[in-house]
Amino acid sequence: MKNRDFEKAVVLIPARMASTRLPGKPLADIGGRPMIVQVALRAREAGAERIVVAVDDEQVFAAVQNAGFDVMMTRGDHQSGSDRIFEALQKADPYGKAEYVINVQGDLPTIEAETIRASLRPMENAAVDIATLTVEITDEEEKTNPNVVKVVGSPLSETRLRALYFTRTTAPYGDGPLYHHIGLYTYRRAALETFVRLPPSPLELRERLEQLRALEAGMRIDAEIVRSVPLGVDTPHDLEKARKILAGRTL
């Protein structure tokens, strides 16, 4: 399935070697391929026509290049993935042909193609600067877990929220659904250019959530509601889960 909007988009996948819980994470073997290559394959399955991996390590660069994907070496001192993908964007698309920039985290080797495609849907509304994803929380423990970021949003439809806030606490108060934020973003190119030039904001620093910088600057973020949270690989246990998931499907 090809999404016509992918013709106007570039998928950028940041990869960093510096992981304290899982050293060498981008090169971890999953199904005979490095994890970062598995993520790029998921983007290809979603219908992406231009996929660029942004790396800070020669070994990762070589692994991605050998797999046939575009790869850009970036500086090692970036403070965030957004800064890294912006540097890669400037190198990969210097003439500004891409209207949308999809930031897929490099530790999501089992992400579903439909989940990636869903991040483009809010861009149908020209007022939206940034799109992201969310899932309704069904696990009671997640509702109070500060490691599960919640989207506080105003419903626009059964499948979309306008994000008003992101928080690690349990919110909003009262009866009704709570939503687990998925850190995959689609930016309008101009919005990404604006975002990376903004200084860290007070709420961003307080909650330790980069996306609050955009909201505090008056940018609009809409969140598409999807079916499930993709597995983020941060620990050896996560890595084993990812291996089992991909072993059960045809690659």
From Swiss-Prot:
The gene is kdsB. CDD domains: CMP-KDO-Synthetase. Gene3D superfamilies: Spore Coat Polysaccharide Biosynthesis Protein SpsA, Chain A. GO terms for cellular component: cytosol. InterPro entries: Cytidylyl_trans, KdsB, Nucleotide-diphossugar_trans. Pfam families: CTP_transf_3. SUPFAM superfamilies: Nucleotide-diphospho-sugar transferases. The keyword S-adenosyl-L-methionine does not apply. It comes from Agrobacterium fabrum (strain C58 / ATCC 33970). This is 3-deoxy-manno-octulosonate cytidylyltransferase. It catalyses: 3-deoxy-alpha-D-manno-oct-2-ulosonate + CTP = CMP-3-deoxy-beta-D-manno-octulosonate + diphosphate. It is found in: Cytoplasm.
